[in-house]
């Protein structure tokens, strides 16, 4: 996929996708450990993913990932599902060499 940053190599985009996937999954571990940093970690992810929107060519999945993360913050009963949905959506983003 050709990205809007002409000089960004696809392997760097792939590494960013892997980072997002791992960071989102890490929220599950924080949640299970009752970490006081769950909320701030999710907010940081929302900011990072939102900031990468242009890099991923304004794909609609970016908004859905952010929406899932926000719902995870606000609806504890939906936390696990929303986090897993967000992580799986990272895999659907076009860009990079392969899927996460």
Residue ranges of model-derived segments:
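Acidic, low-complexity, intrinsically disordered interaction modules
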Residues: 37-78
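Positively charged, low-complexity intrinsically disordered regions
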Residues: 3, 13, 17-19, 49, ...
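Short terminal alpha-helical segments
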Residues: 1-37, 87
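Compositionally biased non-globular segments, especially hydrophobic aliphatic-rich helices
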Residues: 13, 26, 44-47, 75, ...
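Non-catalytic, well-ordered alpha-helical scaffold segments
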Residues: 18-25, 43, 63, 80, ...
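Amphipathic alpha-helical binding modules
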Residues: 64-100
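Alpha-helical repeat scaffolds in large eukaryotic proteins
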Residues: 28-32, 50, 70, 91
């Amino acid at each position: 996929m050709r990205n809007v940053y002409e000089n960004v190599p696809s392997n760097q985009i792939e590494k960013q996708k892997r980072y997002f996937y791992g960071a989102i999954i890490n929220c599950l571990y924080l949640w299970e450990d009752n970490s006081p940093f769950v909320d701030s970690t999710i907010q940081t992810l929302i900011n990072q993913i939102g900031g990468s929107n242009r890099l991923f060519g304004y794909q609609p999945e970016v908004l859905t990932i952010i929406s899932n993360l926000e719902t995870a913050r606000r609806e504890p009963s939906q936390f696990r599902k929303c986090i897993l949905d967000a992580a799986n959506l990272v895999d659907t983003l076009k860009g990079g060499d392969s899927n996460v």
